[in-house]
Every structure is written in C-alpha cells, then in structure tokens.
Amino acid sequence: MLAIENYLILSAILFAIGTIGVLTRRNAIVIFMCIELMLNAVNLTFIAFSRHLGNIDGQVFVFFVMTVAAAEAAVGLALMIAFFKNRESIDVEDVNLMKL
C-alpha cells in the first residue's frame, strides 16, 4: 500500500500541470481540460485524506464535486459551441470581441 505522501505528491503534480496549462494556453478547450485536471487533483487529495483518516466524508464530497464538474462541463461546452458558431474560433483572446 502506498503512503499518503505519494498520493499528495501526485496530486500536486497534476494540479501544477493544470495550472500551467490554464496560464499558458489560448485554446478554450485545452483550458477547460486543464481546469478539469485541477479538479481531479483536488479529488485525489480528498480521497487520499479520506482513506488515511478512515473517514468516508471525503469520498462523499468527491461525488458532489464530480456532479458539479459534470454540470460545469455541459454548460462550458455549450458556451464554447455557441461562441464557435458566432466567431468561427475558440481562441480565448477573441472573447473580448463579444462585447461589440
């Protein structure tokens, strides 16, 4: 069985990759996937602490986070489709043009 430190290190690496992706990418879909990666890193931390402490509360909280993430994905993808139909691009720098 792996120690909790291994799970936390993996979670920190995944969160860092997601953060770098959000800060450096311009494609909305890639940014969206990086945000989901960050959410999954946090979920991994909740599961690791829940297992380490022998408490099921963290696992229950992960189910709620996954439900909210699924709703966020549906709304986010719908917004991206609407934006693509309007501008023929999903570059985040083009979002400012929606004000016109």
UniProtKB/Swiss-Prot annotation:
E.C. no: 7.1.1.-
Q: Which GO terms describe its molecular function?
A: NADH:ubiquinone reductase (non-electrogenic) activity; quinone binding
Give the keywords, sorted.
Cell inner membrane, Cell membrane, Membrane, NAD, Quinone, Translocase, Transmembrane, Transmembrane helix, Transport, Ubiquinone
Could you say which protein family the record assigns here? Answer: Belongs to the complex I subunit 4L family.
Single Gene Ontology BP annotation:
ATP synthesis coupled electron transport
- Top-level division of the source organism's lineage: Bacteria
The transmembrane residues are: 2-22, 29-49, 61-81
What InterPro entries would the database entry show?
NADH_UbQ_OxRdtase_chain4L/K, NUOK/Mnh_C1-like
Q: What is this protein called?
A: NADH-quinone oxidoreductase subunit K 2
What Gene Ontology terms describe where this protein resides (cellular component)?
NADH dehydrogenase complex; plasma membrane
Tell me, in a sentence or two, what this protein's role is: NDH-1 shuttles electrons from NADH, via FMN and iron-sulfur (Fe-S) centers, to quinones in the respiratory chain. The immediate electron acceptor for the enzyme in this species is believed to be ubiquinone. Couples the redox reaction to proton translocation (for every two electrons transferred, four hydrogen ions are translocated across the cytoplasmic membrane), and thus conserves the redox energy in a proton gradient.
Question: Can you state which reaction this protein catalyses?
Answer: a quinone + NADH + 5 H(+)(in) = a quinol + NAD(+) + 4 H(+)(out)
Family matches, as HAMAP family: NDH1_NuoK
Q: Name one Pfam family in it.
A: Oxidored_q2
Bilayer disposition of the protein: Multi-pass membrane protein
Q: Report the locations given in the UniProt record.
A: Cell inner membrane
Describe, as the record does, how this protein assembles with itself and its partners. Answer: NDH-1 is composed of 14 different subunits. Subunits NuoA, H, J, K, L, M, N constitute the membrane sector of the complex.
